[in-house]
Amino acid sequence: YWGKRRGVYSNVMGFLGGINWAILVARICQLYPNASPSMLISRFFRVYSQWKWPNPVTLCHIEEGPLGLPVWDPRRNFRDRGHQMPIITPAYPCMNSSYNVSTSTRYVMIQEFTRGYEICQAIDENRATWDDLFEPYPFFELYKNYLEVGITARNEDDLRNWKGWVESRLRTLVLKFERYTHEMLLAHPHPRDFSDGSRPRHSFYFMGLWRK
């Protein structure tokens, strides 16, 4: 719920999905097995706001299995070395479940973890409430520049298919921004599309742009 409210719940956009969040929460439960629910929430934000990425989050030791299947290993695999925010699945073969994360989306998520921890501290001091933690992310108030990607189709079925195709490639666009500007320009993709009731069979995606 928190991830959706704060705009960081979308694996296809380069954020995290259900499996990723479940592993992150499970790791906190391992670290603090006797903690109360409110303490677990506070520790969640504290740990991940201070986590030394790209050190991986794991629930168990990564082991080579008897079948010889490849497992996540940045020492051997060049592609694994480039992963920004490794969250490793516990079952064999252990793989990075968050390979879609980019420099831009990692930055956004760390900012959100930091905000969450600061609010949890304020809650402990009676300076904030849990409602503050779940405030919607003010996406259209934070950036000076936005990129709009518009989609038009002849009918609703074509629009649905076209939207899926475009959505799956927006992450690649973010990576190209980073690569061709040497990470001087970063992009924050909004995790969902928008529509305009006055323009049927149209849909829009937005990215907030900022310079480092």
Language-model segments: which ranges?
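Non-catalytic helical "accessory" subdomain of NTase-fold nucleotidyltransferases
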Residues: 1-212
